Amino acid sequence: MLKIKLEKSAFENAKAECSLVFIVNKDFNHAWVKNKKLLETFRYEGEDSFLDQENKILYVGVKEDNVHLLRESACSAIRTLKKLAFKSVKVGVYTCHTHSKDNALLENLKALFLGLKLGMYEYDTFKSNKKESVLKEAIIALELHKPCEETCANSLEKSAKEALKYADVMTESLNITKNLVNTPPMIGTPIYMAEVAQKVAKEGNLEIHVYDEKFLEEKKMNAFLAVNKASLGVNPPRLIHLIYKPKKAKKKIALVGKGLTYDCGGLSLKPADYMVTMKADKGGGSAVIGLLNALSNLGVEAEVHGIIGATENMIGPAAYKPDDILISKEGKSIEVRNTDAEGRLVLADCLSYAQDLNPDVIVDFATLTGACVVGLGEFTSAIMGHNEELKNLFETSGLESGELLAKLPFNRHLKKLIESKIADVCNVSASRYGGAITAGLFLNEFIRDEFKDKWLHIDIAGPAYVEKEWDVNSFGASGAGVRACTAFVEELLKKA
């Protein structure tokens, strides 16, 4: 992990083996920009990057005056520098446009520091010829790129320290999530997922309970158990319950995650091409583990419960079948018409368990539907629920954190599509259209009336795992949901 060191000095006086200078919105008129004739000779116009080898300066373009692009450019810069022979880099403080003018400096520092740190991530656990970067340190010269109000300048050091704590915690939490999602299925079993959660709990002084199939049977979590039936003798299920209890808690929040450690579709078998990347079907549960790490280390004033349903969905003589009727923990019967709509079955019972805790807010995270990816693209998560104020708060705070989110609306016509003639509800829609919403409406069937306005469903199927670099995310897992929900909880508590 890249170490960030704060220095109360001018950019020119800070000592490092190389310099990083951002060109914001193609503006070269700044003292930190050297040898402009060289840049003109090579026709560098402030897009992408350019290495001035003589002066040991890496120029990286920030295409617009936007804090999210600053974060992305900082990440891109480190991806370039970590391939070179520099051990340290220095960079000044930039103030790009933010949504919130009150916290503009802090948000810029958070973006800069997080971008720098995330640029170092690469999942290379199984590579035999790892090339470890020599880049170890980023020196932050506490000098502003351009003048700002006196109050802004006076709060620079304080804001930098706060931003650095955020970046350290968020990087660690995202890496926990990403490493778990990226872990291949021969290792990343339900038991392994529980072990990762136990390690996080031990290091963060969190309370944790890990329950096996006997507990699930006692609690009549039959929908969850059905999904695991084909794997029971080899990789049994685990219900993981992490708890963070601060001395002062303004709210009780339950975070619920789908933890499908591998999903072949069950007897409704996926085509081979669609089976690849299904190690990432534990993205929701992994995000919840990362979130408990983030929220506890940031010291939020909320009691937070993280509930993860960890299981495989495989084939075998004991596998649950299309035509089965399952009785959920809530007592509702479910007609199974497709065993590849399994995540919602696990979540149904886990959401029931979460409601027993009587929380003020429930948020579930799941790589739930391919339909969500079709509708919103692979970079955007969907927000669903009944409470418009809660949905809006998650969307605005999540967007400000740098994640992409969009609301999808429930409606009575789509709800009719999951009706069953022989059970209380069907696990798949009668139509191919609106699949992300009908999946959310299925979960809604297991939310009690008193919790309808306290519940949000976040479908992270798109951004949880993408097989290319994008924004601050490397190939593979992105940690979708962690930044967004952390920001959501912080904003929620401000209103408490």
From Swiss-Prot:
Superkingdom field: Bacteria
Cofactor(s) essential for the protein: Mn(2+)
Keyword check for Hydrolase: yes
Catalytic site: K270, R344
One GO BP: proteolysis
EC numbers on record: 3.4.11.1, 3.4.11.10
Gene3D superfamilies assigned: Leucine Aminopeptidase, subunit E, domain 1 (3.40.220.10), Zn peptidases (3.40.630.10)
Compartments, record wording: Cytoplasm
Cofactor note: Binds 2 manganese ions per subunit.
One Pfam family recorded for the sequence: Peptidase_M17_N
Coiled-coil regions, chain positions: none
Gene Ontology MF terms: manganese ion binding; metalloaminopeptidase activity
UniProt keyword Protein biosynthesis, yes or no: no
Any single Gene Ontology cellular-component annotation: cytoplasm
Binding site for Mn(2+) 2: K258, D263, D281, E342
Protein's name in the database: Probable cytosol aminopeptidase
Gene that encodes the chain: pepA
